[in-house]
């Protein structure tokens, strides 16, 4: 599931990286456009 334990409070979920704390949720990552700093991890 989602991982929200990074020092920056970022969320990593199935290849998606939300660099903003509000993007991080207990169930995973916020996939909506309302999340600023939404990036795709091509790796």
Curated annotation (Swiss-Prot):
GO terms for molecular function: ion channel regulator activity; toxin activity. The modification 6'-bromotryptophan is found at residues 31, 40. The modification 4-hydroxyproline is found at residue 36. It is found in: Secreted. Its main location: secreted. Residues 1 form a propeptide. Keywords: Bromination, Disulfide bond, Hydroxylation, Ion channel impairing toxin, Neurotoxin, Secreted, Toxin. GO terms for cellular component: extracellular region. Disulfide bonds join 4-16, 11-24, 18-29, 23-35. Expressed by the venom duct. The cysteine framework is XII (C-C-C-C-CC-C-C). Mu-conotoxins block voltage-gated sodium channels. This toxin reversibly blocks voltage-gated sodium channel in cephalopods, with no alteration in the voltage dependence of sodium conductance or on the kinetics of inactivation. This is Mu-conotoxin-like CalTx 12.2.1E. It comes from Californiconus californicus (California cone).
């Amino acid at each position: 599931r989602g991982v929200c334990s990074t020092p920056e409070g970022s969320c990593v979920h199935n290849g998606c990286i939300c660099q903003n704390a509000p993007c991080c949720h207990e169930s995973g990552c916020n996939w909506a456009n309302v999340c600023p700093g939404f990036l795709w991890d091509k790796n």
